């Protein structure tokens, strides 16, 4: 028994004492296999889940390392049944393997005959299986490779996919490392992905996920399809690939509403390929338009359901998912595991910050008090309207102006979800507003002006949550969001984490109406960043800025 920062409980929850001197080391040790559930001020609650354990196993952690981490940092003896359960759960990964058989094609091989018998009796899985070759091997229809993995995960037997990949159409790509080089963690991430064949790389916003993608493309040396969140991100990818690799402008195509170019490297958006015409997903054929050797899913946690369905049919292609967080608010993390692949590499945000590759950040929650009339409007509103009402209270505008006055020389993003609120803020601050309806050309011109320092403040909607490179943004003020979305909170902080030319830090303000749904959702949103070691400082609007009204 030691005076460690963890209390490990038999219900698979792990309590972390935040103020303990070893809290940071303990958090890093349990992060690969435990998920943060609650993060109040002094004690954080994590849960050890099967999916987290299997992701850890696929990323190279074994049960001995997991047990050692818990025992080393636990204040009291770790319940022995829990340790046994961890060993048993992690041993389930890989008990079934998908293997290419030279005579029979795709097969499911069991290292435990009883497990195969259980699978063969499953009414959903059995129709996807073919002839039984021997006691431990059964044929799998190649078209069912993805769906079999999904269903096996659901019954608690995640299969290790060792069936290999088709190389696709060859297209040589090399990195041009003149004046720059891959950082150690970027190289390790690309190597880990390549060794696993398919899977997800998790890196903080601003840590250079695009370069991990470029390194993977160089390893593949094949035609590549890249799927991103929006057209601005697509063009950013193109600029980066032209600058950092042997690819020329003519080798990279854009498949969008404006252009329909299919080239050796083609970049499209999730919105484009899931657009329906007369009820049909016409552009899903992009997946079959070339013999792609690699498919890259940027911001993989946002993968729409139709793309999941198509990805189930693409299991012979190498697939790389890039993201800052594996959290999906729809709970479909298991589908990412099955269809894109398990987590291959994960770097804690604070580790990358300590190396100087992302800026240190301070997170501040500013609590405002609604006026009597605002409180009455909130109290009498229909339930579905209450969050919008408390998120957009007029009281917040004076607070935002005061925050900006505290940072007159810093480039600032004001971020929200409700367009009326953003338009009002834009008018009050004299700042341009970027939202979904803003033309792509105007959007890019404003982002460029912001990068050059010609525009000091931008008011942005959800369109700026993802993949926008604004290195000198040092202050972000969040006024409203998508309910309790943890991944949105992480992405928004990520907008200001690029290292600054002056080596300075960043400040992320979240302006929240107290005693309301706004405050409840804010607490939920902060969970992921708490898991990464970011603490929120709570400030009262009146104390911090003087009376807001």
Curated annotation (Swiss-Prot):
Keywords: ATP-binding, DNA-binding, Helicase, Hydrolase, Isomerase, Magnesium, Manganese, Nucleotide-binding. ATP binds at residues 203-210. SUPFAM superfamilies: P-loop containing nucleoside triphosphate hydrolases (SSF52540). ATP-dependent 3'-5' DNA helicase, unwinds 3'-overhangs, 3'- flaps, and splayed-arm DNA substrates but not 5'-overhangs, 5'-flap substrates, 3-way junctions or Holliday junctions. Not highly efficient in vitro. Requires ATP hydrolysis for helicase activity; the ATPase activity is DNA-dependent and requires a minimum of 4 single-stranded nucleotides (nt) with 6-10 nt providing all necessary interactions for full processive unwinding. The ATPase prefers ATP over CTP or GTP, is almost inactive with TTP. DNA helicase activity requires ATP or dATP and only acts when the 3'-overhang is >20 nt. ATPase activity has a small preference for Mn(2+) over Mg(2+), Ca(2+) supports ATPase activity less well. Co(2+) and Zn(2+) are inactive. Another study shows equal activity with Mg(2+) and Mn(2+), none with Ca(2+). Removal of the N-terminus decreases solubility and/or structural integrity of the protein. This is DNA 3'-5' helicase XPB. Monomer. The keyword DNA damage does not apply. Its cofactor is Mn(2+); Mg(2+). Residues 399-545 form the Helicase C-terminal domain. It is an enzyme of class 5 (isomerase). NCBIfam families: repair_heli_XPB. A motif (DEAH box) lies at residues 298-301. One of its GO terms (cellular component) is peptidoglycan-based cell wall. PANTHER family: GENERAL TRANSCRIPTION AND DNA REPAIR FACTOR IIH HELICASE SUBUNIT XPB, RAD25/XP-B DNA REPAIR HELICASE. The gene is XPB. It catalyses: Couples ATP hydrolysis with the unwinding of duplex DNA by translocating in the 3'-5' direction; ATP + H2O = ADP + phosphate + H(+). GO terms for molecular function: ATP binding; DNA binding; helicase activity; hydrolase activity. InterPro entries: ATP-dep_DNA_Helicase (IPR050615), ERCC3_RAD25_C (IPR032438), Helicase/UvrB_N (IPR006935), Helicase_ATP-bd (IPR014001), Helicase_C-like (IPR001650), P-loop_NTPase (IPR027417), XPB/Ssl2_N (IPR032830). Residues 190-344 form the Helicase ATP-binding domain. Residues 1-130 are annotated as: Required for protein stability or solubility. The keyword Repressor does not apply.
């Amino acid at each position: 028994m030691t005076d460690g920062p963890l209390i490990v409980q038999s219900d698979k929850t792990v309590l972390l004492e935040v103020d303990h001197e070893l809290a940071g080391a303990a958090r890093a040790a349990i992060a690969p296999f435990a998920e943060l559930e609650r993060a109040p001020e002094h004690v954080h609650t994590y849960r050890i889940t099967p999916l987290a354990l299997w992701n850890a196993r696929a990323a190279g952690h074994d049960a001995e390392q997991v047990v050692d981490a818990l025992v080393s940092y636990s204040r009291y003896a770790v319940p022995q049944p829990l340790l046994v359960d961890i060993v048993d759960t992690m041993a389930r990964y890989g008990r079934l393997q998908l293997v290419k058989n030279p005579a029979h094609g795709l097969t499911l091989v069991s290292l435990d005959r009883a497990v195969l018998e259980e699978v063969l009796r499953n009414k959903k899985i059995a129709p996807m299986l073919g002839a039984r070759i021997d006691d431990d091997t059964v044929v799998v229809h190649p078209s069912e490779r993805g769906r079999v993995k999904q269903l096996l995960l659901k019954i608690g037997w995640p299969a290790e996919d060792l069936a290999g990949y088709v190389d696709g159409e060859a297209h040589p790509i090399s990195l041009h490392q003149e004046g720059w080089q891959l950082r150690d963690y970027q190289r390790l991430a690309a190597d880990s992905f390549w060794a696993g064949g398919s899977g997800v790389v998790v890196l903080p916003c601003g840590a250079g996920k695009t370069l991990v993608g470029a390194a993977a493309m160089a390893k593949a040396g094949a035609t590549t399809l890249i799927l991103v969140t929006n057209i601005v991100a697509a063009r950013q990818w193109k600029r980066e690939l032209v600058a950092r690799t042997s690819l020329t402008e003519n080798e990279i195509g854009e498949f969008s509403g404006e252009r329909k170019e299919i080239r050796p490297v083609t970049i499209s958006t999730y919105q484009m390929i899931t657009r329906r015409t007369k009820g049909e997903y016409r552009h899903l054929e992009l997946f079959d338009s070339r013999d792609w050797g690699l498919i890259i899913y940027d911001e993989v946690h946002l993968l729409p359901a139709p793309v999941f369905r198509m990805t189930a049919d693409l299991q012979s292609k190498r697939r790389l998912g890039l993201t800052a967080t594996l959290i999906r608010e729809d709970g479909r993390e298991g589908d990412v595991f099955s269809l894109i692949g398990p987590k291959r590499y994960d770097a804690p945000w604070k580790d990358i910050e300590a190396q100087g590759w992302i800026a240190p950040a301070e997170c501040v929650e500013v609590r405002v008090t609604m006026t009597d009339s605002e409180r009455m409007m909130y109290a009498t509103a229909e339930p579905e309207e209450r969050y919008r009402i408390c998120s957009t209270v007029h009281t917040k505008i004076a607070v935002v102006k005061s925050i900006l006055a505290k940072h007159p020389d810093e480039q600032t993003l004001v971020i929200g979800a409700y367009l009326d609120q953003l338009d009002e803020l834009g008018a009050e601050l004299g700042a341009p507003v970027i939202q979904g309806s803003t033309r792509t050309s105007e959007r890019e011109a404003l982002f460029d002006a912001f990068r050059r320092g010609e525009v000091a403040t931008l008011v942005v909607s959800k369109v700026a949550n993802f993949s926008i490179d604004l290195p000198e943004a040092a202050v972000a003020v969040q006024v409203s969001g998508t309910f309790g979305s943890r991944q949105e909170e992480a992405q928004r902080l990520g907008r200001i984490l690029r290292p600054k030319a002056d080596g300075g830090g960043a400040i992320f303000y979240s302006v929240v109406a107290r005693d309301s749904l706004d405050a409840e959702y804010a607490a939920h949103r902060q969970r992921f960043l708490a898991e990464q070691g970011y603490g929120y400082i709570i400030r009262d609007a009146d104390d911090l800025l003087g009376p807001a009204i």
